Amino acid sequence: MKRYHFVTALLCTLLSLPSFSQNTDFGRGEVPVTIPSGYNSAEETPLIILLHGYGSTGERQDSYLGFSRIANKYNFLLVTPTGTRESSGRQATFWNATSACCNFQEPSIDDNAYLMGIIERMKEEYNIDSNRVYLVGHSNGGFMSYQLAYNNSETIAAIVSLAGASHADKRESPEHAVHVLQIHGTDDSTIRYEGGDIQGNDYPGANESVSQWAEY
């Protein structure tokens, strides 16, 4: 009976352990990486990349979406990178996704290569399930999620775009299908539900974005 109580107490302790967060330099400075307490290098684990909106940061995005707080419950690895800071003006952080959003100053920034480098590095250091690599992006991060998935459909299994949008230009279908969830408020005045433009560069609406990917 004492042994039973000891094992039960040990299991309860292990299950209540918090996820572990560490910083890793993926080439542009340190980035928070959350590792669930139940991570086992012998088992494949899903990976989520959380992409912030224009002017925000990875840590700030996670602070109100709370992905790191549920990493243990759903057993996934989480990376919350921060984009490039503008060199003048607002000096806001951004992802170079499409012509509409949101690279207004630094045309040479290659966020596709940077983010894919993060995914590849994570695969080298952890046992990542290659069939469960996901992107979650808010606003500008949603734009970036669409673009990363389009350019790397063999790697990205699914994306969630929160008030983001896909590309407005006509393109061939990506090589592989990608699951898409678009969440968008109809009263959004920044990235409009029905679509619009930013500094003269068009972006599709929420319905058009998901219809585009459904046709792919």
Residue ranges and their predicted role:
Residues 123-178, 189:
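Primarily recognizes the serine-hydrolase "nucleophile elbow" in alpha/beta-hydrolase
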